[in-house]
Amino acid sequence: HFPAKEALFEAVVTARITDLVSEARSRADAADPGEAFFGFLSRIAGEAAAKRDLPDAISVSGSLREDLFAALDLLLRRAQQAGAVRAGIVTSDLIVLLKGMFAGLAGSTDPAVHERVFAVLADGLRARA
């Protein structure tokens, strides 16, 4: 039981971020760093389409935010080192892009729209040949 609605929301957000951090860390040792990175972003995009509070969740502060950013940073750097993600992108850029995607899709319930927008985001992150 939670004393207030805010406490329940905080507990849900904490659990969601903790799960995302765990998944990102588990993907960090994948044989294909590009697939690990884009697969994780796809998971985030899919979850955002299903659970509208994810933008608030990735805006969390404190140690959860640090853990999430560190896990994203590790996946991002490994993908960049493997040549899968363009150089020059930093984790804070990635967060801005994700938040922008979430905001732009906030009113859409069409999964095809979410898939297309994520595909464009992912293509923009891919290293140029």
Spans of features found by a protein language model:
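Amphipathic alpha-helical interaction segments
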Residues: 7, 35-43, 93-97, 116-120
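HTH DNA-binding helix-turn interface
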Residues: 1-9
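A short secondary-structure junction motif
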Residues: 19, 47-51, 55, 79, ...
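C-terminal peripheral helix-coil segments that are non-catalytic and often amphipathic
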Residues: 66-85, 97-100, 104-129
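Hydrophobic alpha-helical connector segments
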Residues: 18-50, 61, 67-71
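Short linear capping/connector segments at secondary-structure termini
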Residues: 54-62
